[in-house]
Amino acid sequence: MSRILLDTHLLLWAVAEPRKMPPGVRSRIDAAEVFVSAASIWEVSIKAALGKLAADPAELLAEIEPAGFNLLPVTGEHAAAVARLPAIHADPFDRMLVAQAKTEPLLLLSNDSLLAGYGDCVELIARKPRRT
């Protein structure tokens, strides 16, 4: 069974906006052991407080277990691993997710093309095309 770490966008799509999930990704998630980082909940909390995201972090947290996902805490080992990453991406939340993926090891699914520079621990997922 594959082990997957969802980035924040894919987490939001999976639990709040499944219609945005690209074809085939949902079945991969259903067949895998899936992790959600506590850093993603933190990111949603900050962006919601700044008015940049209309999501309730407490509700998102409550949806993790019913969705069949595992909450991955941020450890000291994860934090130290961030320092070993090349400076490909400046976003601290994304850097933490990459560090967790490399440390655990997990495959990080993301729609952020900058993360591809971190190598085979990241797989890019394109958003489902809009119907016109």
Language model regions located:
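Aromatic- and histidine-enriched alpha-helix N-cap/loop-to-helix transition segments
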Residues: 36-39, 96
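A generic structural signal for short hydrophobic patches within well-formed alpha-helices
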Residues: 11, 41, 79, 115-116
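Generic beta-structure capping elements
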Residues: 15, 39, 74-77
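Phosphate/NTP-binding elements of NTP-utilizing enzymes
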Residues: 44
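Short, well-structured N-terminal submotif of metal-dependent ribonuclease cores
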Residues: 1-36, 49-62, 66, 104, ...
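Active-site regions of enzymes building and remodeling cell-envelope glycoconjugates
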Residues: 119-129
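Active-site neighborhoods of divalent-metal-dependent phosphate/nucleic-acid chemistry enzymes
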Residues: 57-61, 65-114, 125-127
